[in-house]
A protein has these predicted regions:
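Transmembrane beta-barrel domains of bacterial outer-membrane proteins
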Residues: 1-122, 126-130, 137-150, 166-184
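S-adenosyl-L-methionine
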Residues: 162-164
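Outer-membrane beta-barrel signature, preferentially recognizing the C-terminal barrel domain
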Residues: 152-159
Length: 184
């Protein structure tokens, strides 16, 4: 096997380090500007000109008077496979009075900025320190459209459900079971 060009490897490493530093600085600046905010920014594949990025922000709003419920907003902007997708969602999470269980509900809207596809979803979650269950239902809001390479495409309806459980005596190890179905 051929070895990589050391100059190219050095340049790639420098670009990746600079990108990571700038991404972290931008995320920190956003979080300092927006109270109760957590932002993640990821940029990859710059060297092969198929750049992918993901910007996600979760902002928590005021707690309920008893401190056991909180509303949140999640926004994201993703670019992969020559598609840019915007996502916005709102939810509410509830903590049990004994603080052992968290439940939540959410609603999201997805928009493909390149081709105009739209989808809405609703979901729920139930989590403890040892087990978690999430379920989401997705509904297409747009019909068939001309998409990438002029192919006809459309958003699918569907659902997903995931169960995760911590494996006893193996801290930090969780086993997940996931099922999904898409139709349309």
């Amino acid at each position: 096997a051929e070895s990589e060009d050391p100059g190219k490897t050095l340049l790639t490493d420098a670009v990746n380090d600079a990108t990571s530093t700038l991404s972290n600085s931008a995320a920190n600046a956003i979080d300092k500007t927006i109270p109760n905010s957590r932002t993640d920014i990821s940029i990859t594949s710059i060297d092969n000109r198929k750049t992918r990025y993901n910007i996600r922000n979760v902002t928590g709003f005021a707690m309920s008077s008893d401190g056991l419920a909180r509303n949140f907003m999640q926004t994201s902007l993703n670019n992969a496979n020559s598609r840019t997708v915007l996502n916005i969602g709102f939810g509410r999470r509830f903590l049990s009075s004994d603080e052992k269980w968290m439940t939540g509900i959410n609603a999201f809207f997805d928009y493909d900025a390149d081709y105009g596809h739209q989808r809405a979803s609703i979901g729920g979650e139930l989590k403890s320190s040892a087990i978690g269950l999430t379920a989401n239902s997705y509904q297409a809001l747009t019909e068939w459209k001309s998409g990438k390479d002029s192919n006809q495409e459309h958003v699918l309806d569907g659902y997903d459900i995931e169960l995760g459980a911590q494996i006893p005596y193996m801290p930090g190890t969780t086993l997940f079971l996931k099922s999904w179905k898409w139709s349309g």
